[in-house]
Amino acid sequence: MSTEGAYELFKKGSELLEAGDFMAASIPLERAAALEPDKSSIREALGRAYFRSARFEQAAEEFAALVERYPVNDYAHFCLGRSLEKTGRRAEARRHAALAANMRPDRKDYQAFRDRLQTA
């Protein structure tokens, strides 16, 4: 039985995420999230791993948890919007895309995503 702590699991998952092994990254990140469910860095990394492995519903759940806990986290709103769009929930996605774009008008990627959703 492993005695790895949340930080070690987060570090391992982050390394796998950066290496492009998204499915494998979710395993230690899920374990880290179970140990530290309120750690935003772990939840964000897990959401990214789910999104990049096309597990969009699970990604949306992670980013929604971040938004609930940290409503001014522009990146969480942006990622939640992207995840919701991939699940076909465009109306919900528009709301989060608009929030992210309004929070960070300097982010051209946020603006482009918001504009694309508004015209679709």
Residue ranges and their predicted role:
Residues 74, 82-109, 115:
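TPR/TPR-like (Sel1-like) alpha-helical repeat modules
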Residues 19-30, 53-65, 87-99:
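Structural signature of tandem alpha-helical TPR/SEL1-like repeats
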Residues 3-35:
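Alpha-helical segment of the N-proximal tetratricopeptide repeat
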